[in-house]
Amino acid sequence: MTRASQQDVRRRAGWLPADQEGLEAWLRGRRERIADRDPDRVLHPAVAAFRDLVDGDPVLRMHANEMVAQVPSGREYQERHVESFDELLVLIDEVVTTAPEYSEDQMVMTPLDGVLDWTKATPAGFAFYRDPRVNDALRGVLDAWSHFLSSGKSLAVLTDAPSGWRSDAARRAVGMDQFLHDPDDEHWGFASWNDFFTRHFRDGERPVASADDTAVIVSPCEATPYRIASRVHRRDEFWAKAEPYSVEELLAGDESVDAFVDGTVWQAFLSALDYHRWHSPVAGRIVRAWVQPGTYFSEADAQGSDAAEPTLSQGYLAHVATRAVFVIDADDPAIGLVAVVFIGMSDVSSCVIGEGLGAGARVGKGDELGYFQFGGSTVCVLFGPGVVESFSLEAVPQAPDEEPTPLHVRAHLATARRSEEQPG
Protein backbone atom coordinates (compact mmCIF):
# COMPACT_ATOMS: atom_id res chain seq x y z
CA MET A 1 0.00 0.00 0.00
CA THR A 2 1.67 3.21 -1.11
CA ARG A 3 1.40 6.47 0.74
CA ALA A 4 -0.07 8.21 -2.30
CA SER A 5 -2.99 5.79 -2.51
CA GLN A 6 -3.86 5.48 1.18
CA GLN A 7 -7.17 6.68 2.56
CA ASP A 8 -7.84 7.38 6.21
CA VAL A 9 -7.79 3.87 7.65
CA ARG A 10 -9.25 5.01 10.94
CA ARG A 11 -12.33 6.27 9.11
CA ARG A 12 -12.53 3.09 7.06
CA ALA A 13 -12.44 1.10 10.29
CA GLY A 14 -15.26 3.09 11.88
CA TRP A 15 -13.33 4.72 14.73
CA LEU A 16 -14.16 8.18 13.35
CA PRO A 17 -17.01 9.31 11.05
CA ALA A 18 -16.61 8.48 7.38
CA ASP A 19 -16.13 12.12 6.40
CA GLN A 20 -14.93 15.39 7.89
CA GLU A 21 -18.46 16.80 8.01
CA GLY A 22 -19.52 13.98 10.33
CA LEU A 23 -16.64 14.64 12.70
CA GLU A 24 -17.39 18.37 12.80
CA ALA A 25 -21.08 17.68 13.48
CA TRP A 26 -20.06 15.48 16.41
CA LEU A 27 -17.71 18.20 17.69
CA ARG A 28 -20.50 20.80 17.50
CA GLY A 29 -22.59 18.49 19.65
CA ARG A 30 -19.82 18.27 22.23
CA ARG A 31 -19.50 22.06 22.34
CA GLU A 32 -23.24 22.41 22.81
CA ARG A 33 -23.03 19.97 25.69
CA ILE A 34 -20.33 21.92 27.51
CA ALA A 35 -22.21 25.20 26.87
CA ASP A 36 -24.89 23.91 29.27
CA ARG A 37 -22.34 22.76 31.83
CA ASP A 38 -22.40 24.22 35.34
CA PRO A 39 -19.57 26.81 35.37
CA ASP A 40 -18.77 25.84 38.96
CA ARG A 41 -18.27 22.18 38.10
CA VAL A 42 -14.71 21.13 38.91
CA LEU A 43 -12.55 19.14 36.55
CA HIS A 44 -11.95 15.44 37.13
CA PRO A 45 -8.75 15.06 39.22
CA ALA A 46 -6.90 13.46 36.29
CA VAL A 47 -7.83 16.33 33.97
CA ALA A 48 -6.96 18.86 36.68
CA ALA A 49 -3.53 17.24 37.03
CA PHE A 50 -3.03 17.60 33.27
CA ARG A 51 -4.00 21.27 33.50
CA ASP A 52 -1.64 21.88 36.43
CA LEU A 53 1.26 20.26 34.57
CA VAL A 54 0.79 22.54 31.57
CA ASP A 55 0.18 25.67 33.66
CA GLY A 56 3.34 25.03 35.67
CA ASP A 57 5.73 24.78 32.73
CA PRO A 58 6.27 27.74 30.37
CA VAL A 59 7.29 25.60 27.38
CA LEU A 60 4.31 23.26 27.70
CA ARG A 61 2.00 26.23 28.19
CA MET A 62 3.40 27.82 25.04
CA HIS A 63 2.92 24.64 23.00
CA ALA A 64 -0.59 24.12 24.41
CA ASN A 65 -1.75 27.58 23.41
CA GLU A 66 0.01 27.50 20.05
CA MET A 67 -1.45 24.13 19.02
CA VAL A 68 -4.95 25.53 19.56
CA ALA A 69 -4.16 28.70 17.61
CA GLN A 70 -2.34 27.03 14.71
CA VAL A 71 -4.11 25.52 11.68
CA PRO A 72 -3.80 21.71 11.45
CA SER A 73 -2.09 20.11 8.48
CA GLY A 74 -4.13 17.76 6.30
CA ARG A 75 -7.56 18.83 7.57
CA GLU A 76 -10.04 21.22 6.02
CA TYR A 77 -12.08 22.29 9.02
CA GLN A 78 -15.06 24.51 8.26
CA GLU A 79 -14.93 26.00 11.75
CA ARG A 80 -12.88 25.92 14.92
CA HIS A 81 -14.23 23.58 17.55
CA VAL A 82 -11.93 24.85 20.28
CA GLU A 83 -10.87 28.42 21.06
CA SER A 84 -8.55 27.92 24.02
CA PHE A 85 -6.66 25.29 25.96
CA ASP A 86 -9.07 25.79 28.86
CA GLU A 87 -11.97 24.90 26.58
CA LEU A 88 -10.07 21.84 25.38
CA LEU A 89 -9.71 20.74 29.01
CA VAL A 90 -13.48 20.93 29.49
CA LEU A 91 -14.05 18.87 26.33
CA ILE A 92 -11.61 16.26 27.67
CA ASP A 93 -13.37 16.32 31.03
CA GLU A 94 -16.70 15.50 29.38
CA VAL A 95 -15.17 12.47 27.65
CA VAL A 96 -13.91 10.99 30.92
CA THR A 97 -17.47 10.42 32.18
CA THR A 98 -19.21 9.29 28.99
CA ALA A 99 -19.20 6.11 26.91
CA PRO A 100 -19.26 6.05 23.08
CA GLU A 101 -22.74 6.23 21.59
CA TYR A 102 -23.91 4.54 18.40
CA SER A 103 -24.54 6.60 15.28
CA GLU A 104 -24.90 5.62 11.65
CA ASP A 105 -23.15 8.75 10.34
CA GLN A 106 -21.46 10.58 13.25
CA MET A 107 -20.10 7.77 15.40
CA VAL A 108 -16.87 8.58 17.24
CA MET A 109 -15.51 5.54 19.04
CA THR A 110 -12.31 7.35 20.03
CA PRO A 111 -13.69 10.59 21.52
CA LEU A 112 -10.41 11.86 22.96
CA ASP A 113 -8.90 11.45 19.53
CA GLY A 114 -11.85 13.43 18.16
CA VAL A 115 -11.53 16.39 20.51
CA LEU A 116 -7.72 16.48 20.17
CA ASP A 117 -7.77 16.04 16.39
CA TRP A 118 -7.20 19.72 15.60
CA THR A 119 -4.27 20.10 17.97
CA LYS A 120 -2.44 16.87 17.12
CA ALA A 121 -1.72 17.86 13.52
CA THR A 122 -0.12 21.25 14.24
CA PRO A 123 3.61 21.98 14.57
CA ALA A 124 3.21 22.77 18.27
CA GLY A 125 1.07 19.67 18.75
CA PHE A 126 3.75 17.38 17.34
CA ALA A 127 6.13 18.60 20.06
CA PHE A 128 3.51 18.73 22.83
CA TYR A 129 2.25 15.15 22.53
CA ARG A 130 5.75 13.69 22.39
CA ASP A 131 6.75 15.22 25.72
CA PRO A 132 7.05 12.38 28.30
CA ARG A 133 5.38 14.51 30.98
CA VAL A 134 2.36 15.12 28.76
CA ASN A 135 2.26 11.43 27.99
CA ASP A 136 2.24 10.55 31.70
CA ALA A 137 -0.57 13.03 32.36
CA LEU A 138 -2.62 11.67 29.47
CA ARG A 139 -2.10 8.17 30.82
CA GLY A 140 -3.84 9.36 33.97
CA VAL A 141 -6.73 10.75 31.91
CA LEU A 142 -7.06 7.47 30.00
CA ASP A 143 -6.93 5.46 33.23
CA ALA A 144 -9.78 7.60 34.58
CA TRP A 145 -11.82 7.02 31.43
CA SER A 146 -11.11 3.29 31.56
CA HIS A 147 -12.29 3.24 35.19
CA PHE A 148 -15.58 4.83 34.11
CA LEU A 149 -15.98 2.44 31.16
CA SER A 150 -15.51 -0.49 33.54
CA SER A 151 -18.23 0.79 35.88
CA GLY A 152 -21.96 0.24 35.79
CA LYS A 153 -22.49 3.92 34.93
CA SER A 154 -21.17 3.25 31.42
CA LEU A 155 -24.17 0.99 30.71
CA ALA A 156 -26.25 4.12 30.02
CA VAL A 157 -25.45 3.69 26.31
CA LEU A 158 -26.61 0.05 26.18
CA THR A 159 -30.24 0.96 25.55
CA ASP A 160 -32.84 0.72 22.79
CA ALA A 161 -32.59 4.46 22.03
CA PRO A 162 -31.43 5.45 18.51
CA SER A 163 -27.98 6.21 19.95
CA GLY A 164 -27.97 3.06 22.08
CA TRP A 165 -26.16 -0.16 21.30
CA ARG A 166 -29.33 -2.25 21.73
CA SER A 167 -31.05 -0.37 18.89
CA ASP A 168 -31.90 -2.40 15.79
CA ALA A 169 -29.38 -0.48 13.68
CA ALA A 170 -26.55 -1.01 16.17
CA ARG A 171 -27.41 -4.69 16.63
CA ARG A 172 -27.16 -5.24 12.87
CA ALA A 173 -23.94 -3.22 12.57
CA VAL A 174 -22.27 -5.18 15.37
CA GLY A 175 -23.65 -8.54 14.25
CA MET A 176 -24.74 -9.19 17.80
CA ASP A 177 -26.27 -12.58 17.08
CA GLN A 178 -22.79 -14.08 16.69
CA PHE A 179 -21.70 -12.93 20.17
CA LEU A 180 -22.51 -14.31 23.60
CA HIS A 181 -25.16 -12.16 25.33
CA ASP A 182 -28.46 -12.40 27.20
CA PRO A 183 -31.16 -10.97 24.90
CA ASP A 184 -33.64 -10.80 27.79
CA ASP A 185 -31.46 -8.64 30.04
CA GLU A 186 -31.79 -4.85 29.75
CA HIS A 187 -28.03 -4.58 29.18
CA TRP A 188 -27.61 -7.98 27.44
CA GLY A 189 -26.00 -9.31 30.61
CA PHE A 190 -22.93 -7.08 30.40
CA ALA A 191 -21.58 -5.42 33.54
CA SER A 192 -20.07 -2.37 31.81
CA TRP A 193 -19.14 -0.82 28.47
CA ASN A 194 -15.75 -2.55 28.58
CA ASP A 195 -17.47 -5.86 29.25
CA PHE A 196 -19.65 -5.29 26.17
CA PHE A 197 -16.71 -4.15 24.06
CA THR A 198 -14.61 -7.23 24.87
CA ARG A 199 -17.52 -9.60 24.21
CA HIS A 200 -16.87 -13.21 23.21
CA PHE A 201 -17.96 -15.03 20.08
CA ARG A 202 -20.42 -17.87 20.44
CA ASP A 203 -18.87 -21.33 20.30
CA GLY A 204 -18.20 -22.38 16.72
CA GLU A 205 -18.27 -18.87 15.24
CA ARG A 206 -14.53 -18.67 14.49
CA PRO A 207 -13.05 -22.17 14.09
CA VAL A 208 -9.28 -22.62 13.94
CA ALA A 209 -8.11 -23.05 10.35
CA SER A 210 -6.42 -26.41 9.69
CA ALA A 211 -6.16 -27.07 13.40
CA ASP A 212 -3.91 -30.13 12.95
CA ASP A 213 -1.58 -28.66 10.32
CA THR A 214 1.30 -26.92 12.09
CA ALA A 215 2.38 -25.18 8.87
CA VAL A 216 -0.87 -23.21 8.73
CA ILE A 217 -0.58 -19.95 10.70
CA VAL A 218 -3.82 -18.24 11.77
CA SER A 219 -4.87 -14.62 12.19
CA PRO A 220 -4.46 -13.33 15.76
CA CYS A 221 -7.26 -10.76 15.39
CA GLU A 222 -10.43 -9.96 13.49
CA ALA A 223 -8.68 -7.36 11.36
CA THR A 224 -8.39 -5.90 7.85
CA PRO A 225 -4.98 -6.47 6.21
CA TYR A 226 -2.97 -3.25 5.97
CA ARG A 227 0.56 -4.07 4.83
CA ILE A 228 3.02 -6.88 4.14
CA ALA A 229 6.72 -5.98 4.27
CA SER A 230 9.63 -8.29 3.46
CA ARG A 231 13.35 -8.12 4.24
CA VAL A 232 12.75 -5.76 7.15
CA HIS A 233 15.77 -4.10 8.75
CA ARG A 234 17.04 -4.22 12.30
CA ARG A 235 16.91 -0.41 12.42
CA ASP A 236 15.19 1.89 9.97
CA GLU A 237 13.68 5.37 9.79
CA PHE A 238 10.19 4.35 10.92
CA TRP A 239 9.24 8.04 11.24
CA ALA A 240 9.83 8.65 7.51
CA LYS A 241 6.99 9.08 5.03
CA ALA A 242 7.21 5.48 3.75
CA GLU A 243 7.09 4.19 7.35
CA PRO A 244 9.47 1.23 7.03
CA TYR A 245 9.49 -1.24 9.89
CA SER A 246 12.39 -1.10 12.34
CA VAL A 247 12.50 -4.43 14.17
CA GLU A 248 14.58 -3.22 17.10
CA GLU A 249 12.11 -0.45 17.98
CA LEU A 250 9.04 -2.52 17.14
CA LEU A 251 10.14 -5.16 19.67
CA ALA A 252 11.53 -2.57 22.11
CA GLY A 253 15.05 -3.99 21.94
CA ASP A 254 14.06 -7.53 22.91
CA GLU A 255 16.81 -10.16 22.63
CA SER A 256 14.80 -11.95 19.92
CA VAL A 257 15.33 -9.10 17.42
CA ASP A 258 18.01 -10.95 15.41
CA ALA A 259 15.56 -13.75 14.60
CA PHE A 260 13.37 -11.34 12.59
CA VAL A 261 15.94 -9.23 10.73
CA ASP A 262 15.43 -9.72 6.95
CA GLY A 263 12.12 -11.39 7.79
CA THR A 264 8.50 -10.47 7.11
CA VAL A 265 5.96 -8.26 8.90
CA TRP A 266 2.20 -8.56 8.34
CA GLN A 267 0.06 -5.73 9.74
CA ALA A 268 -3.73 -5.34 9.96
CA PHE A 269 -6.16 -2.87 11.57
CA LEU A 270 -9.18 -3.62 13.74
CA SER A 271 -12.66 -2.25 13.12
CA ALA A 272 -14.50 -0.34 15.82
CA LEU A 273 -17.49 -2.67 15.69
CA ASP A 274 -15.71 -6.00 15.57
CA TYR A 275 -14.07 -8.41 17.99
CA HIS A 276 -11.23 -7.05 20.15
CA ARG A 277 -9.62 -10.12 21.69
CA TRP A 278 -6.28 -11.58 20.59
CA HIS A 279 -5.37 -15.18 19.78
CA SER A 280 -2.15 -17.07 19.18
CA PRO A 281 -1.24 -17.56 15.50
CA VAL A 282 0.68 -20.77 16.28
CA ALA A 283 0.95 -23.51 18.87
CA GLY A 284 4.03 -23.20 21.02
CA ARG A 285 5.66 -21.87 24.16
CA ILE A 286 5.62 -18.21 25.17
CA VAL A 287 9.21 -17.01 25.49
CA ARG A 288 8.25 -13.53 26.71
CA ALA A 289 5.09 -11.44 26.99
CA TRP A 290 4.93 -7.86 28.21
CA VAL A 291 3.19 -4.52 27.79
CA GLN A 292 5.55 -1.90 26.40
CA PRO A 293 4.62 1.64 27.51
CA GLY A 294 4.49 4.21 24.74
CA THR A 295 2.93 7.42 23.52
CA TYR A 296 -0.81 8.01 23.24
CA PHE A 297 -1.44 10.83 20.75
CA SER A 298 1.85 11.24 18.89
CA GLU A 299 1.71 11.51 15.10
CA ALA A 300 4.42 11.26 12.46
CA ASP A 301 5.12 14.76 11.21
CA ALA A 302 6.96 13.60 8.06
CA GLN A 303 3.71 12.91 6.25
CA GLY A 304 2.79 16.34 4.94
CA SER A 305 -0.93 16.54 4.26
CA ASP A 306 -1.47 13.09 5.79
CA ALA A 307 -0.16 14.15 9.19
CA ALA A 308 -3.56 14.48 10.83
CA GLU A 309 -4.62 10.94 9.94
CA PRO A 310 -3.74 8.72 12.91
CA THR A 311 -4.05 5.44 11.09
CA LEU A 312 -2.01 6.70 8.20
CA SER A 313 0.66 6.61 10.92
CA GLN A 314 0.07 2.92 11.63
CA GLY A 315 3.62 1.87 10.80
CA TYR A 316 5.02 4.75 12.87
CA LEU A 317 2.74 4.05 15.83
CA ALA A 318 3.70 0.38 15.87
CA HIS A 319 7.12 1.55 17.07
CA VAL A 320 6.13 4.22 19.62
CA ALA A 321 2.61 3.51 20.90
CA THR A 322 1.65 1.43 23.92
CA ARG A 323 1.68 -2.22 22.82
CA ALA A 324 1.55 -5.78 24.09
CA VAL A 325 4.34 -7.98 22.72
CA PHE A 326 4.42 -11.78 22.61
CA VAL A 327 7.43 -13.78 21.47
CA ILE A 328 6.37 -17.39 20.86
CA ASP A 329 8.57 -20.38 20.06
CA ALA A 330 6.40 -22.39 17.68
CA ASP A 331 6.13 -26.16 18.04
CA ASP A 332 6.85 -26.44 14.32
CA PRO A 333 10.66 -26.06 14.00
CA ALA A 334 10.22 -24.75 10.46
CA ILE A 335 8.50 -21.68 11.94
CA GLY A 336 10.71 -21.05 14.95
CA LEU A 337 10.14 -17.75 16.74
CA VAL A 338 7.04 -15.68 15.95
CA ALA A 339 6.44 -12.24 17.44
CA VAL A 340 2.95 -10.77 17.74
CA VAL A 341 2.56 -7.08 18.60
CA PHE A 342 -0.86 -5.70 19.59
CA ILE A 343 -0.71 -1.91 19.30
CA GLY A 344 -3.00 0.63 20.93
CA MET A 345 -3.52 3.96 19.20
CA SER A 346 -4.67 7.31 20.61
CA ASP A 347 -7.27 6.63 23.29
CA VAL A 348 -7.38 2.89 22.59
CA SER A 349 -4.10 2.11 24.27
CA SER A 350 -5.15 -0.30 27.02
CA CYS A 351 -3.54 -3.70 26.31
CA VAL A 352 -4.45 -6.52 28.71
CA ILE A 353 -2.46 -9.77 28.63
CA GLY A 354 -4.40 -12.85 29.71
CA GLU A 355 -3.83 -14.22 33.20
CA GLY A 356 -1.03 -16.77 33.42
CA LEU A 357 0.32 -16.04 29.94
CA GLY A 358 3.89 -15.24 30.85
CA ALA A 359 7.22 -16.81 29.97
CA GLY A 360 7.02 -20.60 29.75
CA ALA A 361 3.25 -20.83 29.28
CA ARG A 362 2.07 -23.08 26.48
CA VAL A 363 -0.57 -21.97 23.99
CA GLY A 364 -2.44 -23.83 21.32
CA LYS A 365 -3.02 -22.41 17.87
CA GLY A 366 -5.96 -20.02 18.17
CA ASP A 367 -5.88 -19.85 21.99
CA GLU A 368 -6.78 -16.48 23.52
CA LEU A 369 -3.87 -14.24 24.54
CA GLY A 370 -5.58 -11.06 25.79
CA TYR A 371 -7.61 -8.09 24.61
CA PHE A 372 -7.84 -4.36 23.99
CA GLN A 373 -9.99 -2.42 26.46
CA PHE A 374 -12.20 0.46 25.28
CA GLY A 375 -11.08 -0.21 21.73
CA GLY A 376 -8.28 -1.68 19.72
CA SER A 377 -6.23 -0.65 16.80
CA THR A 378 -3.66 -2.65 14.90
CA VAL A 379 -1.62 -5.83 15.04
CA CYS A 380 1.74 -6.88 13.61
CA VAL A 381 2.99 -10.46 13.17
CA LEU A 382 6.73 -10.93 12.62
CA PHE A 383 8.31 -13.97 10.96
CA GLY A 384 11.94 -14.88 10.45
CA PRO A 385 13.52 -14.89 6.97
CA GLY A 386 12.33 -17.68 4.70
CA VAL A 387 9.59 -18.86 7.08
CA VAL A 388 6.49 -17.85 5.11
CA GLU A 389 5.85 -19.71 1.88
CA SER A 390 2.66 -17.78 1.07
CA PHE A 391 -0.08 -15.62 2.53
CA SER A 392 -3.71 -16.55 2.08
CA LEU A 393 -5.61 -14.48 -0.47
CA GLU A 394 -7.76 -12.98 2.32
CA ALA A 395 -4.62 -11.85 4.18
CA VAL A 396 -3.35 -9.70 1.30
CA PRO A 397 -4.08 -5.95 1.72
CA GLN A 398 -6.91 -4.58 -0.41
CA ALA A 399 -6.93 -1.53 -2.62
CA PRO A 400 -7.74 1.53 -0.46
CA ASP A 401 -10.91 2.30 -2.42
CA GLU A 402 -12.40 -1.11 -1.63
CA GLU A 403 -14.77 -1.79 1.25
CA PRO A 404 -12.71 -3.07 4.22
CA THR A 405 -13.07 -6.82 4.59
CA PRO A 406 -11.58 -8.21 7.80
CA LEU A 407 -9.71 -11.46 7.92
CA HIS A 408 -11.52 -13.50 10.56
CA VAL A 409 -9.69 -14.25 13.77
CA ARG A 410 -8.24 -17.79 13.71
CA ALA A 411 -8.67 -17.92 9.91
CA HIS A 412 -5.82 -18.92 7.59
CA LEU A 413 -3.22 -16.14 7.60
CA ALA A 414 -0.16 -17.75 6.05
CA THR A 415 1.46 -21.07 5.25
CA ALA A 416 4.97 -21.77 6.47
CA ARG A 417 7.53 -23.64 4.42
CA ARG A 418 7.63 -27.28 5.40
CA SER A 419 10.80 -28.36 7.18
CA GLU A 420 12.31 -29.91 4.09
CA GLU A 421 11.64 -26.68 2.15
CA GLN A 422 13.62 -24.41 4.46
CA PRO A 423 16.37 -22.56 2.61
CA GLY A 424 19.93 -23.22 3.52
Where are the predicted features?
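Contiguous, well-folded functional domains in the mature portion of proteins
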Residues: M1-G424
